[in-house]
């Protein structure tokens, strides 16, 4: 028995060490199989961490879980479900999500991890000195009376020497009622760890915005804005955070919110990306048109109007009013929407872009439209004006037409696609510049990286895409901090700095530190979606945590909930289902 246990500890440590060394070398692999039904994955710092909902854990950790079942095996899962909780829902037969191990099995794995790191276990065949591995966390099925859903182990090191280990137990229950007392939690911690004094730290999270699906055909975006507040000490359970707290806005925004004020601009960006992909791959996936008339009809009418007017000013005004009216919607906050009206100074090329980007559905459309334009320029039917600074092929032809001579352009191959892409880039860059400078959120110097014409056209498109995401972030936050210009300015600079150094990432969470006094109206009369108290003394690893939340923080368990027909749709936190988490720990000294 002991020999088998020793071999198991040696093998488990060896497999974990191999995975850890691969991670340090930058080798990313899928979870490895430890046993037939057990897999281990290493979560790197910055990756989505399932423990963040409980311990605000965001460092590198090992996660041990059950191997997902094959689809044909899922029909047997109901026999394994406990009375109060159930392993993740298999009804769809698709991705079943993470799965938990029995609590007994989890304890065995924690025991092997502990044995392997114990310097007193000199009989183990492990190379010395033992490498201190990242914390190990095991998903549990909550099958014990305590409702254990996680077991964890984290090493204690002193001067690069392993001196002990902290063992964590996380439990979770779903209930409509809760009963807990702060003093009782403090006394529990004192008694468990033989302490005379303790410190408490509070945390509250307020969900300011979370996108929802418009209907069954349009899925919800991943946009989410939350206000996180921390403070110390804590006076009582569910204490409203004091104004002396530390507060941070956590912002994750997915571009293209269907009901947002930037929807029309995002549609133009999507068309720009279609052209860029077509130029790069030779295959163009055209968008559905927004106009009933064909692109050729719209361009011909546009040219006729210019010819009749013998000028450009009135035409610009007319198109601007039409576009503004077209994109107006009562669903959008008008105070924000007023910032995003179509510019009143659209030149010929920009108006042409607006018409063609909403109606072109084929390569033939491009060729026919540009043929009409070039013929009108050659005949002198129109002499449109342009903004200065454009290096597009169309602008060069227009400037040449002023002098009665034009280069011959062969509208074949990728040339028509590139011509439209160039004028679209010019137009969108000016749109973004107009907003950022007009709102005094950035200078041309700040924006130089995003609008520089010196890089190749594909990189220009990519940088404009980044700039659009920054704009989406600001628009999403404006309802909450619109009156706080310094906060909008700070957020703009944070985003600009990030995107100068990193690739486009709409899953990235941008963090904006704020003063509680500046956002007190957002939380003082609201119920938090998550409220947590941590009690500790001395080492912060040694702590007791109690948390209340209105959604399950455990992604591998489904809780049987009471009948929601009894609950009000907009009820307070007390009227909805609760999820209470308790984290306790014990410390083991090796030396």
From Swiss-Prot:
InterPro entries: Zwilch. Its main location: nucleus. Gene3D superfamilies: 1.10.287.1880, 1.20.58.730, 2.20.25.230, 6.10.140.520, 6.20.270.10. Keywords: Cell cycle, Cell division, Centromere, Chromosome, Kinetochore, Mitosis, Phosphoprotein. GO terms for biological process: cell division; mitotic spindle assembly checkpoint signaling; protein localization to kinetochore; regulation of attachment of spindle microtubules to kinetochore. The modification Phosphoserine is found at residue 88. It is found in: Chromosome, Centromere, Kinetochore. GO terms for cellular component: cytosol; kinetochore; kinetochore microtubule; RZZ complex. The keyword Cell cycle applies. Pfam families: Zwilch (PF09817). Component of the RZZ complex composed of KNTC1/ROD, ZW10 and ZWILCH; in the complex interacts directly with KNTC1/ROD. Essential component of the mitotic checkpoint, which prevents cells from prematurely exiting mitosis. Required for the assembly of the dynein-dynactin and MAD1-MAD2 complexes onto kinetochores. Its function related to the spindle assembly machinery is proposed to depend on its association in the mitotic RZZ complex. ZWILCH gene is deleted in a patient suffering from colorectal cancer with chromosomal instability. Belongs to the ZWILCH family. This is Protein zwilch homolog. It comes from Homo sapiens (Human). The lineage of its organism: Eukaryota, Metazoa, Chordata, Craniata, Vertebrata. The gene is ZWILCH.
């Amino acid at each position: 028995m002991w020999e088998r246990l020793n071999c198991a500890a040696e093998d488990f440590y060896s497999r974990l060490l191999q995975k850890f060394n691969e991670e340090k070398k930058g080798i990313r692999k899928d979870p490895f199989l430890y046993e037939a039904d057990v897999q281990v994955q290493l979560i790197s710092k910055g990756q989505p961490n399932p423990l963040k909902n409980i311990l605000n854990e965001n460092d590198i950790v090992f996660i041990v879980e059950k191997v997902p079942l094959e689809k044909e095996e899922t029909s047997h899962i109901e026999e394994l479900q406990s009375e109060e909780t159930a392993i993740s829902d298999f009804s769809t037969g698709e991705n079943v999500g993470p799965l938990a191990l029995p609590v007994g099995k989890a304890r065995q794995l924690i025991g092997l991890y502990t044995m392997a790191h114990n310097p007193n276990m000199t009989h183990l065949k492990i190379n010395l000195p033992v490498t201190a591995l990242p914390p190990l966390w095991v998903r549990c099925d909550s099958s014990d009376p305590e409702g254990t859903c996680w077991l964890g182990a984290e090493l204690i090191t002193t001067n690069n020497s392993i001196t002990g280990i902290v063992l964590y137990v996380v439990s979770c229950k779903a209930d409509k009622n809760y009963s807990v007392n702060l003093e009782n939690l403090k006394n529990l911690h004192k008694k468990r760890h033989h302490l005379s004094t303790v410190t408490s730290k509070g945390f509250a999270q307020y969900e300011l915005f979370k996108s929802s699906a418009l209907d069954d055909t349009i899925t919800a975006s991943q946009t989410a804005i939350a206000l996180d507040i921390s403070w110390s000490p804590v006076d009582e359970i569910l204490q409203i955070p004091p104004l002396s707290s530390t507060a941070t806005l956590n912002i994750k925004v997915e571009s293209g919110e269907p009901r947002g004020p930037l929807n029309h601009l995002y549609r133009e960006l999507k068309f720009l990306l279609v052209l860029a992909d077509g130029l790069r791959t030779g295959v163009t996936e055209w968008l559905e048109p927004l106009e009933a008339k064909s692109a050729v009809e719209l361009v011909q009418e546009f040219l006729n109007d210019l010819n009749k007017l013998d000028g450009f000013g009135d035409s610009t005004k007319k198109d601007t009013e039409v576009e503004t009216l077209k994109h107006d919607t009562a669903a959008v906050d008008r105070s924000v929407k007023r910032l995003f009206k179509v510019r009143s100074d659209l030149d010929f090329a920009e108006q042409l872009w607006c018409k063609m980007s909403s109606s072109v559905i084929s390569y033939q459309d491009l060729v026919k439209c540009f043929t009409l334009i070039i013929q009108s320029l050659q005949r002198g039917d129109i002499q449109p004006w342009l903004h200065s600074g454009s290096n597009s092929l169309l602008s060069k032809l227009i400037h040449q037409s002023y002098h009665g001579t034009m280069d011959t352009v062969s509208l074949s191959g990728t040339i028509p696609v590139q011509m439209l892409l160039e004028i679209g880039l010019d137009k969108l860059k000016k749109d973004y510049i107009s907003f950022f400078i007009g709102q005094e959120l950035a200078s041309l110097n700040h924006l130089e990286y995003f609008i520089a014409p010196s890089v190749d056209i594909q990189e220009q498109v990519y940088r404009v895409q980044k700039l659009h995401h920054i704009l989406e972030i600001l628009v999403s936050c404006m309802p909450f901090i619109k009156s706080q210009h310094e906060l909008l300015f700070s957020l703009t600079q944070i985003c600009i700095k990030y995107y100068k150094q990193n690739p486009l990432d709409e899953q990235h969470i941008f963090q904006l530190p704020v003063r509680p006094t500046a956002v007190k109206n957002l939380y003082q009369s609201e119920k938090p979606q998550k409220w947590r108290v941590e009690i500790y003394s001395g080492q912060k690893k040694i702590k007791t945590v109690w948390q209340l939340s209105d959604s399950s923080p455990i992604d591998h368990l489904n809780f049987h909930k009471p009948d929601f027909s009894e609950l009000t749709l907009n009820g307070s936190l007390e009227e909805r289902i609760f999820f209470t988490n308790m984290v306790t720990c014990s410390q083991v000294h090796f030396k």
